[in-house]
Amino acid sequence: MKKFLTVWGLLLFISITSYSQEKKYALYSVAFYNLENLFDTIHDAGKNDFEYLPNGKNKWNSMKYEAKLKNMSEILSQLSTDKLPLGPTIIGMSEVENRRVLEDLLKQPALSDRGYEIVHYEGPDRRGVFPVGLPISSE
């Protein structure tokens, strides 16, 4: 009887400890955001970006550009933070004028500590906005 109880207790202990071990998973988040014509104030040759120049239709200037960068970076910095403190691993972005505006965006205080690297493809959009920018976290 004592041997039976010892074996039974050992089996019970093994089964309890094997079920109580939590599986660990790596969690990644992917987000997408339309930056709605994120243009800088500098004309790019071959692009129809004239309405986003200081003398253009939108009277686009450094103050407006910096405000848009700040607002967009604050919004992007809040994506997925309910699950991941540093936000999404990958953020797809559309309506980005060029790589330079992505670099400016990622230098903003709200995003600068995230460790994002840029994958950008310059394409033939008639408005001067190619729809693909992809910051990817190296963390």
Language model features by range: what are they?
Residues M1-K23:
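Bacterial Sec-dependent N-terminal signal peptides
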Residues S18-D113, V119-V132:
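N-terminal, active-site-proximal structural segment of metallo-dependent hydrolase catalytic domains
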